[in-house]
Amino acid sequence: MHMYRSHTCADLSAQDVGKTVRLSGWVHRVRDHGGVLFIDLRDHYGITQVLCDPDSPVFEQMEQVRAEWCIRVDGVVKARDASLINPKISTGEIELFVKDLEVLGASEELPLQVFGDQEYPEETRLKYRYLDLRRANMQANMKLRSDVVASLRQQMWKADFREFQTPIITASSPEGARDFLVPSRLHPGRFYALPQAPQQFKQLLMVSGFDKYFQIAPCFRDEDPRADRSPTDFYQLDIEMSFVTQQDVFDVIQPVLTQVFEQFGNGKAVDQEWPQISYKDAALWYGSDKPDLRNPIKMQSVSEHFAGSGFAIFANLLEQEGTEIRAIPAPGGGSRKFCDRMNAFAQKEGLPGMGYIFWRDQGAGMEAAGPLAKNIGPERTEAIRQQLGLGVGDAAFFLGGKPKAFETVAGKARNHIGMELGLTDQNRFAFAWIVDFPIYEKDSETGRIDFEHNPFSMPQGGLEALQGDPLSVVGYQYDLSCNGYELVSGAIRNHKPEIMFKAFEIAGYGEDEVRKRFGGMVNAFQYGAPPHGGCAAGIDRIVMLLAEEANIREVILFPMNQRAEDLMMSAPSEPESEQLMELGLRVIPKD
């Protein structure tokens, strides 16, 4: 018999009754029923009930065992009485009568219990992550993560992609976030960087003649933490292909993700049609470039109904350049109580409130109610109702100003309305491609033109497009949203040096600076670079959605906390003075 186990804690069934077996695992819980000791023994695979009575030679030893001790037991498999069968576990028809027991690893008093559903502070869970990971939900999440990564790999191999590993230590490259810098001992005063993404390397692979590349890639970004984002590192399915169009990229990644969500989505519906929505329309309709399409609400511009109206706030606002009034329909939200709740929501978001109209039954007909309805009159109110397709029992909320200033709050209000009114389908994965991202934006204070999104995407229209108004230039850049989260981001790359130099020139970067920052890639593009493009899918977010977790740290093995600290490993830590001397560094305290 094997030194530690002949079976796992999920293997045994009624067919094994009478066999002598050996199990190893952790003590999930201990119970004393009338002098008979019961232990639920747990390993990675499942739970087996083991027991012994006072006549057993290991009874006294078993009395000493406590929760989360690691033990080995030998015993005989017994059938449970029919009334004691536990259908909730795979071994529920049997129990193991212990003949021998060995303590493999005793445990000190536990800072958190593995058994049960008790909640603990996140700081405690992260400090003792190895205990937290023993809990059933965390085991399930990590198994799911492993299975998702395996499925992604298998599908990419099946599609004839080659898996390559790109460097982890490289040059600093401004890609939208702060780099983690690594000082060089051999080159004092110079620094490497951990890659924010394998962006340049995967493009260089295309120049090197490899047609289809993928990698389960670690990415490192010094970012402020959010519930859906790790502050230091994350993993992505990184993809790049040569001689492809934007639609080719969509056609590759859609079946891959569809299979993953169908396979691991717990029976939720997976949309088969993935609409392509322009960035401009996404901002107008949803107030977000990662819309949640489970919510059917579409915002609309209603400026014409308020121009010159009796509602002076909106009428005066529309006289300013670049302003707009938008409506958020709320089917089923037609009560003053709900409208007041939404006003309170807007105030929490930093607004004075939201204008609203709601429609109610007045016996002989329909009546529009609310302060806006009184100010703009029945004709304008009716025109708004017809445009939005609303009726009795419905409402509409209104925000105005320069769209960039209110779109984010409008999007949050749309999401809140959808959840409050039960309009958002909780049993569905809804996908949408967001396309036609603007390449440039103007700083409202300085008037300076800078990149709004990926500077390496090919402008639609090529070099000719860059000769006109920069703010009208859109790129072959795309994101994939699912249920309000950005899952995929990608682009068809700007592989022509002359177009790249012009694109950067518009944003104020000269050719010399571009060569200095991106010299490796720019030089390579001078030697017959093929048209190429790709994307990257965030594995952490995919698993978070599939596991129905609101916090991304629930699907990462050893995450940092909100302050980018590893409480378990005490990172970041202060270096030894000798280490600093070797690197030619000195720590200057902040005042």
UniProtKB/Swiss-Prot annotation:
GO terms for molecular function: aspartate-tRNA ligase activity; aspartate-tRNA(Asn) ligase activity; ATP binding; nucleic acid binding. This is Aspartate--tRNA(Asp/Asn) ligase. Its EC number is 6.1.1.23. It catalyses: tRNA(Asx) + L-aspartate + ATP = L-aspartyl-tRNA(Asx) + AMP + diphosphate. It comes from Roseobacter denitrificans (strain ATCC 33942 / OCh 114). The keyword Acetylation does not apply. Aspartyl-tRNA synthetase with relaxed tRNA specificity since it is able to aspartylate not only its cognate tRNA(Asp) but also tRNA(Asn). Reaction proceeds in two steps: L-aspartate is first activated by ATP to form Asp-AMP and then transferred to the acceptor end of tRNA(Asp/Asn). HAMAP family: Asp_tRNA_synth_type1. Pfam families: GAD, tRNA-synt_2, tRNA_anti-codon. One of its GO terms (cellular component) is cytoplasm. L-aspartate binds at residues 175, 221, 453, 493.
